[in-house]
Amino acid sequence: MYNGIVLVDKPAGLTSFDVVAKLRKIFQQKQVGHTGTLDPSVTGLLVIVLGKATKLIDYLQENQKQYRGTLILGLKTDTQDMDGQVTEMQFLKEAIADFKKKAAFDSFLGSSDQLPPMYSAVKVGGKHLYELARKGETIERKSRKIKVMEFQQVGGSKFDASKGQEYINFVATVSKGTYIRTLIEDFGAKLGLPATMMRLRRIEADGYDVKNSINLEEILASKTPRKFIIPMEKLLPTLPKYSVGSDDWQLIKNGGWLKELPISVSPVKIFYNNSFQAIYEKQDGFYKPKKMLIHEDH
């Protein structure tokens, strides 16, 4: 079994699960997942986790995500993107003043609550919201805490006088679980206008950049796909690591506690024979297992 991550540049037209399914076949193992869904129309960085690395998703997701895209002012759809049905249109006579757009962008900076859209993979009562949305149903959802570190226009906007619409390129840096589609619709609401997402690309996630990702087709066509795997030992570089000897290893591989470590930090990556085998956290004077990754494979 392979353990580690693969940085995939997801093309438009595929769901995140489609990519996972293809890589399960390529690597011939079931234990394959990802750290954050991308909608079918969205391109960019999809971090695929293999084997024991699936246990590290929570740690990987702690890093921010960055997107670049284009939004439309003057148009609104039921899916908040161009895949849906138009639900509202408002003809703009002229482009919105830059200072008004900046004020609207800036108003989202910081922490806030965001209501997940009906067209999303969030589960309520065992069903995905998008399954209910496709039936025309709208149900009550719980808002989620999000944080927006950056949300601003990039370059000049384009105004189409014939359509009465304005197209704005933007960049957004956000916490996990933030829906950019919803952010855009809310941005339009701040201006008193319908708005929807035209295109979107994820350029950073979990501490990695799309510049270092691999085109999906290249991975699928490769005779040696394992060369694209970033091994477990290179993951979570900001966490301190400690290499144990054979005595401590006998305790660790059975989930045992450790009294003391030469480094007084927590959490800590535990290595044995140069392999990343566990994450321990200090509790009540002892180092206790938080994530067990015991493996001898790739």
UniProtKB/Swiss-Prot annotation:
Active site (record annotation): D39 (nucleophile)
Annotated keywords: Isomerase, tRNA processing
Cited SUPFAM superfamilies: Pseudouridine synthase (SSF55120)
InterPro entries: PsdUridine_synth_cat_dom_sf, PsdUridine_synth_N, tRNA_psdUridine_synth_TruB, TruB_C
GO BP annotations, alphabetical order: mRNA pseudouridine synthesis; tRNA pseudouridine synthesis
Keyword Ribonucleoprotein: no
EC number(s) on file: 5.4.99.25
Alphabetized Pfam families for the sequence: TruB_C_2, TruB_N
GO molecular function, one term: RNA binding
Top-level taxonomic group: Bacteria
Catalytic reactions on record: uridine(55) in tRNA = pseudouridine(55) in tRNA
NCBIfam families: TruB
Function: Responsible for synthesis of pseudouridine from uracil-55 in the psi GC loop of transfer RNAs.
Family, as annotated: Belongs to the pseudouridine synthase TruB family. Type 1 subfamily.
Protein name listed in UniProt: tRNA pseudouridine synthase B
Organism: Oenococcus oeni (strain ATCC BAA-331 / PSU-1)
